[in-house]
């Protein structure tokens, strides 16, 4: 997921996507602890996606304040 894809979405869509990605990260961490995760790099990708979504949300709020 790229930032350019995220900046065109509404704030409601971004918050829903953020909630879904956090749930996905939780599931990945549970799988990692249970030794069921075949690719631990997925956790890194999920964290980066969450950071991108948070950046888009913060950009939306900072642009609406001005």
Swiss-Prot record:
Disulfide bonds: none annotated. One of its GO terms (biological process) is translation. PROSITE patterns: RIBOSOMAL_L29 (PS00579). It comes from the Bacteria. Pfam families: Ribosomal_L29 (PF00831). Keywords: Ribonucleoprotein, Ribosomal protein. The keyword Ribosomal protein applies. GO terms for cellular component: cytosolic large ribosomal subunit. Coiled coil: none annotated. GO terms for molecular function: structural constituent of ribosome. This is Large ribosomal subunit protein uL29. Belongs to the universal ribosomal protein uL29 family. Signal peptide: none annotated. InterPro entries: Ribosomal_protein_uL29, Ribosomal_uL29, Ribosomal_uL29_CS, Ribosomal_uL29_sf.
């Amino acid at each position: 997921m790229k930032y350019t894809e995220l900046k065109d979405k509404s704030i409601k869509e971004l918050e829903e996507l953020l909630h879904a990605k956090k749930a996905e990260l939780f599931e990945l961490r549970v799988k990692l602890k249970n030794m069921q995760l075949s690719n631990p790099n997925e956790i890194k990708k999920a964290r980066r996606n969450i950071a991108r979504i948070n950046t888009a949300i913060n950009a939306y709020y900072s642009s609406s304040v001005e």
